[in-house]
Amino acid sequence: MREELFYWEEIFYMFWYIDPYYFMLIVPAMLIALLAQARVSSTFNRYSRVYSHRGITAAQVARNILDENGLYDVQVQRVAGSLTDHYDPRSNVVRLSDSVYTSTSIAAIGVAAHEVGHAIQHATDYAPLTLRNAIIPVTNLGSRLSIPLIIAGLLFSAQPLVQIGILAFSLMVVFQLVTLPVEFNASNRA
C-alpha cells in the first residue's frame, strides 16, 4: 500500500511541482507590467475629458508639428483601436487610434505629439531608436511566446520550457529598458 502511494506521489510531483522561485521572478514582473498599463489607461481617460482651448484635433496638431520640423513626407493616418498609436518608420507614417485622431482633448494631443516625436527621432537618425527598431522582431516573438511557454512548462513540469519562457520574458524587459530613453526623448521632442 505504501509503495503504491509513493508511486502516485512521484507522478504528482513530476507533473505538478511548481518551483516557487519562478513565481518570485515572474509574478512581480507581470504585476508591474499590468499596473503600468493600468496607469497609462487611467491617466489617458482622466485627461481625455480636458479639452484644448484652441479646439484643434490631435491629427491637426500632429500635422502641424511635422510641418514645423520639415517632415512633409510623413503621413498622419487613422488606425482602429484605442491607444494603438504608433510611428511606423518603414512606411513613414504616424498612426493615431480612433480615440486620438479626431479628439481635441489634451490627452489625445499629447499622444499625437509623442508619436510625432518618434518621427522626428527617425528623421534625425537618433541612435537609440535605431537600436530599438533593430531588436523589435526578436522582442515581438518573445512577447508572444513567453507566457505560453512558461505556463506549458509549469503544467507539464518541463523545466526547459519554463527557462526558455523566462528568457523570452527577459528579452521583453531588456527591450523596455532600451525603449525608455527613446520614449522620454520622443516626449521631449514633441
Where are these regions (language model features)?
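Residues within membrane-spanning alpha-helices of integral membrane proteins
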Residues: 147, 166-169
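Post-HExxH zinc-binding segment in Zn-dependent metallohydrolases
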Residues: 136-159
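Helix-coil boundary and interhelical linker segments in multi-pass alpha-helical membrane proteins
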Residues: 14-22, 154-164
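Alpha-helical transmembrane segments of multi-pass membrane proteins
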Residues: 29-35, 153, 168-180
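Alpha-helical membrane association modules
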Residues: 161-167, 181, 189
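Polar-ligand-bearing catalytic/cofactor-coordination segments
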Residues: 2, 6-20, 37-140, 174-190
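Short, electropositive, low-hydrophobicity segments enriched in small/polar residues
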Residues: 121, 157, 169
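N-terminal, Lys/Arg- and Ser/Thr-rich interaction peptides
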Residues: 21-39
